[in-house]
């Protein structure tokens, strides 16, 4: 088993996807798509370390330009900025964890969202997914 891991960091529950490169059916390579707490992600990575080829971490902090035009009110903007900053910190900590554990990883700039319908057209995953989980899964398939 050779795994690619996708992570969409979040303070409460990060999107997590595990993709097995050795499965013959390309449309059926996801072995896990779910939401995990920060600590559960660390445990999963540590336990599966010997199988992991690379961890792809969604790194929104690499995007220099932000668009606040659609958000009204300074208080709302401040709350959104704080939440985004906290999520970015989780991503940075996960990258540091991979570094410390000797797990190969790459920081990936997010490219956009995909619908559940579109995601399921790409693979044979039948379970429910939320946006964070789909974002994590799309990191490992390079979209």
Ranges and model annotations:
Residues 2-143:
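Phosphate- and other anionic-substrate recognition elements at nucleic-acid/protein interfaces
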